[in-house]
Protein backbone atom coordinates (compact mmCIF):
# COMPACT_ATOMS: atom_id res chain seq x y z
CA UNK A 1 0.00 0.00 0.00
CA UNK A 2 1.51 3.31 -1.08
CA UNK A 3 1.61 6.10 1.46
CA UNK A 4 0.18 9.50 0.71
CA UNK A 5 2.85 11.97 -0.46
CA UNK A 6 1.38 14.57 1.87
CA UNK A 7 -0.30 13.62 5.17
CA UNK A 8 -3.31 15.64 6.42
CA UNK A 9 -1.11 17.90 8.54
CA UNK A 10 0.92 18.74 5.44
CA UNK A 11 -2.26 19.75 3.61
CA UNK A 12 -3.22 22.07 6.48
CA UNK A 13 0.22 23.72 6.35
CA UNK A 14 -0.03 24.15 2.58
CA UNK A 15 -3.54 25.60 2.82
CA UNK A 16 -2.74 27.99 5.66
CA UNK A 17 0.11 29.38 3.58
CA UNK A 18 -2.13 29.51 0.52
CA UNK A 19 -4.84 31.43 2.35
CA UNK A 20 -2.25 33.74 3.92
CA UNK A 21 -0.78 34.45 0.48
CA UNK A 22 -4.17 34.97 -1.20
CA UNK A 23 -5.40 37.13 1.70
CA UNK A 24 -2.28 39.29 1.60
CA UNK A 25 -2.45 39.54 -2.19
CA UNK A 26 -6.13 40.53 -2.05
CA UNK A 27 -5.36 43.11 0.65
CA UNK A 28 -2.51 44.52 -1.43
CA UNK A 29 -4.72 44.69 -4.52
CA UNK A 30 -7.55 46.20 -2.48
CA UNK A 31 -5.37 49.07 -1.28
CA UNK A 32 -4.15 49.68 -4.84
CA UNK A 33 -7.64 49.51 -6.31
CA UNK A 34 -8.98 51.79 -3.58
CA UNK A 35 -6.33 54.38 -4.40
CA UNK A 36 -7.02 53.95 -8.11
CA UNK A 37 -10.72 54.52 -7.52
CA UNK A 38 -10.18 57.55 -5.31
CA UNK A 39 -7.67 59.26 -7.58
CA UNK A 40 -7.95 58.03 -11.16
CA UNK A 41 -11.64 57.20 -11.40
CA UNK A 42 -13.14 60.15 -9.56
CA UNK A 43 -14.65 62.36 -12.23
CA UNK A 44 -14.38 59.61 -14.86
CA UNK A 45 -17.12 57.39 -13.47
CA UNK A 46 -20.62 58.44 -12.56
CA UNK A 47 -21.20 58.75 -8.80
CA UNK A 48 -23.27 55.55 -8.96
CA UNK A 49 -20.53 53.54 -10.68
CA UNK A 50 -17.88 54.97 -8.35
CA UNK A 51 -20.01 53.78 -5.42
CA UNK A 52 -20.17 50.31 -7.03
CA UNK A 53 -16.38 50.31 -7.38
CA UNK A 54 -15.96 51.38 -3.75
CA UNK A 55 -18.30 48.59 -2.62
CA UNK A 56 -16.11 46.08 -4.47
CA UNK A 57 -12.99 47.43 -2.74
CA UNK A 58 -14.65 47.37 0.68
CA UNK A 59 -15.83 43.77 0.37
CA UNK A 60 -12.47 42.70 -1.03
CA UNK A 61 -10.69 44.21 1.97
CA UNK A 62 -13.07 42.70 4.54
CA UNK A 63 -12.65 39.27 3.04
CA UNK A 64 -8.89 39.59 2.55
CA UNK A 65 -8.77 39.98 6.34
CA UNK A 66 -11.14 37.01 6.70
CA UNK A 67 -8.71 34.93 4.63
CA UNK A 68 -5.84 35.89 6.93
CA UNK A 69 -7.93 34.84 9.94
CA UNK A 70 -8.77 31.60 8.13
CA UNK A 71 -5.06 30.90 7.64
CA UNK A 72 -4.45 31.27 11.37
CA UNK A 73 -7.50 29.19 12.32
CA UNK A 74 -6.38 26.28 10.15
CA UNK A 75 -3.50 25.59 12.50
CA UNK A 76 -5.25 26.60 15.73
CA UNK A 77 -8.61 24.80 15.63
CA UNK A 78 -10.04 21.33 15.20
CA UNK A 79 -12.49 22.47 12.51
CA UNK A 80 -10.08 21.87 9.63
CA UNK A 81 -12.54 20.87 6.91
CA UNK A 82 -14.99 23.69 7.71
CA UNK A 83 -12.14 26.21 7.82
CA UNK A 84 -10.93 24.97 4.42
CA UNK A 85 -14.44 25.45 3.03
CA UNK A 86 -14.45 28.97 4.49
CA UNK A 87 -11.12 29.85 2.90
CA UNK A 88 -12.05 28.62 -0.54
CA UNK A 89 -15.49 30.25 -0.28
CA UNK A 90 -13.95 33.59 0.67
CA UNK A 91 -11.51 33.30 -2.24
CA UNK A 92 -14.25 32.50 -4.75
CA UNK A 93 -16.50 35.15 -3.25
CA UNK A 94 -13.90 37.89 -3.58
CA UNK A 95 -13.18 36.97 -7.17
CA UNK A 96 -16.83 36.71 -8.21
CA UNK A 97 -18.46 39.39 -6.03
CA UNK A 98 -15.81 42.09 -6.15
CA UNK A 99 -14.60 41.09 -9.61
CA UNK A 100 -18.04 41.43 -11.14
CA UNK A 101 -18.57 44.80 -9.44
CA UNK A 102 -15.20 46.08 -10.71
CA UNK A 103 -16.12 44.96 -14.21
CA UNK A 104 -19.57 46.54 -13.95
CA UNK A 105 -18.17 49.86 -12.71
CA UNK A 106 -15.43 50.02 -15.34
CA UNK A 107 -17.38 48.79 -18.36
CA UNK A 108 -20.98 49.69 -17.59
CA UNK A 109 -22.05 46.26 -18.86
CA UNK A 110 -25.01 45.65 -16.56
CA UNK A 111 -25.29 41.91 -17.24
CA UNK A 112 -22.12 41.53 -15.16
CA UNK A 113 -24.16 42.50 -12.12
CA UNK A 114 -26.16 39.30 -12.58
CA UNK A 115 -23.30 37.13 -11.30
CA UNK A 116 -22.58 39.32 -8.28
CA UNK A 117 -25.08 37.45 -6.05
CA UNK A 118 -23.21 34.20 -6.72
CA UNK A 119 -20.14 35.78 -5.17
CA UNK A 120 -22.24 37.07 -2.30
CA UNK A 121 -23.52 33.56 -1.61
CA UNK A 122 -19.93 32.28 -1.63
CA UNK A 123 -19.00 34.91 0.96
CA UNK A 124 -21.99 33.89 3.11
CA UNK A 125 -20.96 30.24 2.85
CA UNK A 126 -17.50 31.24 4.06
CA UNK A 127 -18.91 32.93 7.16
CA UNK A 128 -21.27 30.02 7.84
CA UNK A 129 -18.38 27.56 7.51
CA UNK A 130 -16.36 29.55 10.05
CA UNK A 131 -19.31 29.43 12.45
CA UNK A 132 -19.53 25.65 11.97
CA UNK A 133 -15.78 25.34 12.60
CA UNK A 134 -16.34 26.72 16.10
CA UNK A 135 -18.05 23.46 17.09
Q: Where does each model-flagged region fall?
A:
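N-terminal polybasic/positive-inside topogenic patches
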Residues: 5-7
Amino acid sequence: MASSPCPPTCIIVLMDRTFMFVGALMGFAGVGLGAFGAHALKGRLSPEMLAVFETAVRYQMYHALALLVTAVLLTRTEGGRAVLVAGWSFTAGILIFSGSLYALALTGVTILGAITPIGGVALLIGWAALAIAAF
